[in-house]
């Protein structure tokens, strides 16, 4: 029987944002179940709950981060973390490598773009986890070309014009981040691309069979091994890596609802909306007359604690037809028989979880890869509806009714079923994700 001393050890360095923690810990569980020992290096900022993962070793590094509220946007937090973690991470990794005779590699989130210099210095394999799908990955990879051609400045004046280099996408879909200083976004793209191209390989929580053309294009651009082994959450029932407590009462509420009757609404863990949009969504959900489960995390609404701006009696007048929670166990909610639609920000984790359960989507993207995902959901895969203009209550109401009760919604539901079946096949013996995981494990053991 292998012990910690004889098992190959993988070090993991997740980026401390919810949408990045989840896939990294899912990946950690996959490797643990395949015989690897796992050591998680993490920042003090948004540090994970180690008690949820007693089978892993955790090592904390200082990040000296200021209060998150003091930063103008999340990109500045990202850059500051990359700057302040260089020395602590380097010291930590050097120590771990010297102490672990069976150390195999380190897997880092792509947003830790500073790590490539250190691992080259230590001559230690570094594999990168990219938490977007292949379509968004290819779009990000063309950043330098799109910048040179002036496309980024056309996102408002020619928003609906097609992007010749990226079939299906329009100027407004380009996955850039709105920042106080445009140079900050450029710095991020350049840093991430350089880090990816100098890595020992790239892992995707994606399905090769759904994006074969994009994978071929990515392989031309990136001369390193690429491994599509998603969906991560379907391999093992992982412990929670959520930074917020799940409100489990939503599952018992779903138990009382009719099959495929509930619209589930969640706009992710980072984006925020203004008071006006929040109220429009609230009235749109209410006026649709469909049962709804709505995740409103603290901080979702600019300047507000939670849902105190809802009109007096709003929740009471729903008479149990709607439920609002601060956070929910999303995979379980989407897998519930009562859930029939998903109003989503289109982050890739959420999009993939929706596809896995064949749940049609209403897309309300905010930034980054969410725009690419929304375009694919609406125009390429045709498995949802896209809210492209200002969010108004009538638009929300009509979208919910279309998705949940119309013949158009039924056609969408029929189109998403084969995608779910493709995902299920890819995980089986001989499937693309099964095969790619075997290749990835063999690759790591070859170092």
UniProtKB/Swiss-Prot annotation:
EC number: 2.4.1.-
Keywords of this entry: Glycosyltransferase, Plant defense, Transferase
Presence of the UniProt keyword Glycosyltransferase in the record: yes
Any one GO MF annotation of this record: salicylic acid glucosyltransferase (glucoside-forming) activity
GO BP term, example: leaf senescence
Residues noted as binding UDP-alpha-D-glucose in the record, renumbered to the chain: 269, 327-328, 345-353, 367-370
Gene3D superfamilies according to UniProt: Glycogen Phosphorylase B
Phenotype upon loss of function: Reduced rosette size, early leaf senescence, enhanced resistance to the biotrophic pathogen Pseudomonas syringae, increased susceptibility toward necrotrophic Alternaria brassicicola and constitutively elevated salicylic acid (SA) levels.
Top-level taxon of the source organism: Eukaryota
Tissues expressing the protein: Expressed in roots, leaves, hydathodes, sepals and style.
Cited InterPro entries: UDP_glucos_trans, UDP_glycos_trans_CS
PROSITE patterns according to UniProt: UDPGT (PS00375)
Induction: Induced by wounding and the bacterial pathogen Pseudomonas syringae pv. tomato (avirulent avrRpm1 strain).
Similarity field: Belongs to the UDP-glycosyltransferase family.
Biological role: Glycosylates the amino acid-related molecules isoleucic acid (2-hydroxy-3-methylpentanoic acid) and valic acid (2-hydroxy-3-methylbutyric acid). Acts as a negative regulator of salicylic acid (SA)-dependent plant defense in the absence of pathogens and promotes the jasmonate (JA) response. Negatively influences the onset of senescence.
Protein's name according to its UniProt entry: UDP-glycosyltransferase 76B1
Species of the source: Arabidopsis thaliana
């Amino acid at each position: 029987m292998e012990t910690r001393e004889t098992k190959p050890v993988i070090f993991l360095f997740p980026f401390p944002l919810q949408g990045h923690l989840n896939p990294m810990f899912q990946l950690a569980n996959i490797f643990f179940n395949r015989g690897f020992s796992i050591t998680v290096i993490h920042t003090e900022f948004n540090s994970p709950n180690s008690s949820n993962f007693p089978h892993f070793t955790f090592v904390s590094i200082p990040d000296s981060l200021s209060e998150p509220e003091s930063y103008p946007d999340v990109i500045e937090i990202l850059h500051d973390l990359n700057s302040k973690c260089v020395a602590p991470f380097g010291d930590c990794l050097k120590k771990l490598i010297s102490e672990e005779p069976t150390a195999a590699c380190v897997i880092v989130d792509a947003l830790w773009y500073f790590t490539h210099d250190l691992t080259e210095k230590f001559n230690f394999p570094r594999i990168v986890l990219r938490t977007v799908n292949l379509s968004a990955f290819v779009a990000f990879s063309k950043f330098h070309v799109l910048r040179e051609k002036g496309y980024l400045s056309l996102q408002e004046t020619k928003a609906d014009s097609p992007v010749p280099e990226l079939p299906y996408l329009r100027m407004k879909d380009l996955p850039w981040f709105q920042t106080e200083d445009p140079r900050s976004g450029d710095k991020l793209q350049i840093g991430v691309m350089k880090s990816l191209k100098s890595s020992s390989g790239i892992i995707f929580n994606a399905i090769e069979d759904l994006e074969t053309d994009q994978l071929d294009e990515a392989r031309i651009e990136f001369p390193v091994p690429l491994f599509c082994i998603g969906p991560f959450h379907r391999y093992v029932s992982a412990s929670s890596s959520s930074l917020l407590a799940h409100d489990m009462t939503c599952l018992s509420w779903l138990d009382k609802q009719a099959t495929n009757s509930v619209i589930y609404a969640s706009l992710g863990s980072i984006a925020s909306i203004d008071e006006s949009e929040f109220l429009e969504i609230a009235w749109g959900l209410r006026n649709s007359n469909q049962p709804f489960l709505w995740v409103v995390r603290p901080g979702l609404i600019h300047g507000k604690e939670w849902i105190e701006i809802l009109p007096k009696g709003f929740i009471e007048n729903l008479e149990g037809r709607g439920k609002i929670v601060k956070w929910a166990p999303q995979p379980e909610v989407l897998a519930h028989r009562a859930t029939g639609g998903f109003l989503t920000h289109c982050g890739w984790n959420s999009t993939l979880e929706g596809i896995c359960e064949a749940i049609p989507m209403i897309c309300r993207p905010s930034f980054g890869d969410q725009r690419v995902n929304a375009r694919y959901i609406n125009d390429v895969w045709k498995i949802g509806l896209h809210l492209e203009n200002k969010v108004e209550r009538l638009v929300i109401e009509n979208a919910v009714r279309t998705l949940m009760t119309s013949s158009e919604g039924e056609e969408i539901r029929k189109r998403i079923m084969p995608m779910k079946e493709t995902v299920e096949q890819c995980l089986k013996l001989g499937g693309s994700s099964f095969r790619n995981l075997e290749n990835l494990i063999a690759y790591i053991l070859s170092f």
